[in-house]
């Protein structure tokens, strides 16, 4: 038996990653700080609360010269990266937040705004309901097959849970071409 259900995600994540490279660490940190400030200004203008986003620590990677003859190692430059993870309470605003953050690409280079990814955090409650529906569907199909062959149904001898899948949603015209993680609605499917 098969059961399907269209479910709206209850959590959205938008990642903003910005980086720079410079021979002077202070200049690189200043550049990162400016990008962080611009991201936070947009989040404040959209009235997101501080508990709806998280600023990750700055990551600094020095790049060294590779001359084997020299006894001392020399730092050529620094790669500096930081990210902000946004998890809006109202996931309906995710597209609006994403579009507004995209404007930063006009001002800053080396900035990636990742499309919102949507998650169903309470998936277990849907699994149980789908298993019940799929089992009922299997029983109904078995009865129909037996009627065609003029047989009667006996007791249930065995049942195996098959696949549980999260499939892309084809009903949301705005996101129909997006990958499943980037769709707010998902199609859950259970087979028994």
Residue ranges and their predicted role:
Residues 1-192:
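Short, charge-dense linear interaction motifs
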